Regions:
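Conserved glycosyltransferase catalytic-site signature
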Residues: 22, 75, 79, 186-193
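A glycosyltransferase accessory/donor-loop signature
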Residues: 2-9, 44, 58-59, 141-147, ...
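GT-A fold catalytic core of metal-dependent nucleotide-sugar glycosyltransferases
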Residues: 65, 74-127
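Short, acidic, metal-binding catalytic loop of nucleotide-sugar glycosyltransferases
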Residues: 31-39
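Short, hydrophobic beta-strand segments that form beta-sheet elements in well-ordered domains
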Residues: 40-48
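Conserved catalytic core of nucleotide-sugar-dependent glycosyltransferases
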Residues: 108-169
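Active-site-proximal specificity loops/subdomain of glycosyltransferases
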Residues: 47-85
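N-proximal low-complexity "stem/linker" segments adjacent to membrane-targeting elements
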Residues: 1-23
């Protein structure tokens, strides 16, 4: 890979199971192509032998094949980002995210950093989320409030050792959870990364990274468990770039939509049509 831009890119895991995560990664790739002015390359980690539609191939920078986990809960490979990324500088994303604005300034600000996690999230109204409803384990164990849905890292020796510790926790999570108060019932990527960070680093994690987190109980409304059953939303492309309004609030930050049925064939077609306009 040649050129400055090739040294920076996005990475996501899209291992299909109950849901079509590769399709979500395709939509994510389109949202990056339509929103990012400089760095818009997305590499995708998929199940071995996964058949990728031709139109997806044109938008994925790299396709990285890994073994399919036995469990339907496809997070077991989330420790592997460090070894699998093709980039010198990587922003890791959950594949159920959308971008509407350019984040080139983020990349610039991250140039003198080596590892940064999102620690603050907002709801669809743009208000900072303070609820710990989904974060009892973090609160009970004084873990750093890290979110792996969007984080950045460089290839460094210290980070290599950190990711080795993350791997150890992933592979022995039930034993590690015995050391925690109020542990989750299942393996949590956020908990594993936060626990490793607490052990390995002596630092604060506050920074500017931010995304809109659409878990229903984090909004300023009394919603159904599936937020998209309570809140109206619609896409527009008046300026030849997609925009999303949720309950008439324009979405500015990376949008972690969570609900897989939020992505319909109509949304895919909307993005494909918009991409053709560029």
């Amino acid at each position: 890979m040649l050129g400055e831009n090739m040294n920076k890119g996005f990475l996501t895991i899209a291992q299909n199971g109950e849901h079509d995560y590769v399709k979500m990664a395709y939509l994510l790739a389109m949202s990056l192509k339509t929103s990012q002015e400089k760095y818009n390359k997305l590499s995708v980690i998929v199940n071995e032998n996964e058949e990728i539609p031709e139109k997806y191939l044109k938008l994925f920078d790299n396709i990285i094949y890994v073994e399919k986990p036995d469990s339907e809960w496809k997070i077991q490979n989330k420790w592997r980002y460090y070894g699998l990324t093709p980039y010198d500088e990587t922003i890791v994303l959950d594949c159920d995210m959308l971008f509407f604005n350019d984040i080139s300034t983020w990349w610039k600000c991250l140039e003198d950093k080596t590892l940064e996690f999102t620690t603050k999230t907002i709801n669809y109204r743009g208000n900072e989320i303070t609820s710990t409803y989904y974060r009892k384990t973090f609160e009970s164990n004084n873990l750093p409030n890290l979110h792996t849905a969007l984080f950045y890292f460089k290839k460094t020796k210290q980070n290599e050792y950190y990711f080795r510790l993350v791997k150890m926790i992933f592979e022995n999570w039930e034993e590690f959870y015995k050391l925690l108060k109020d542990p989750p019932k299942f393996l949590s990527g956020d908990v594993a990364y936060a626990l490793a960070a607490k052990v390995w680093f002596n630092r604060k994690w506050d920074n500017f990274l931010k995304f809109t987190h659409m878990r229903s109980r984090l909004q300023d409304d009394d919603l159904f468990d599936e937020w998209n059953q309570s809140l109206p939303s619609f896409f527009t492309n008046y300026n030849k770039k997609p925009e999303l309004k949720v309950n008439n609030f324009n979405q500015i930050y990376p949008f972690h939509y969570i609900q897989k049925d939020f992505i319909t064939d109509e949304v895919i077609e909307f993005y494909e049509d918009t991409l053709r306009l560029l």
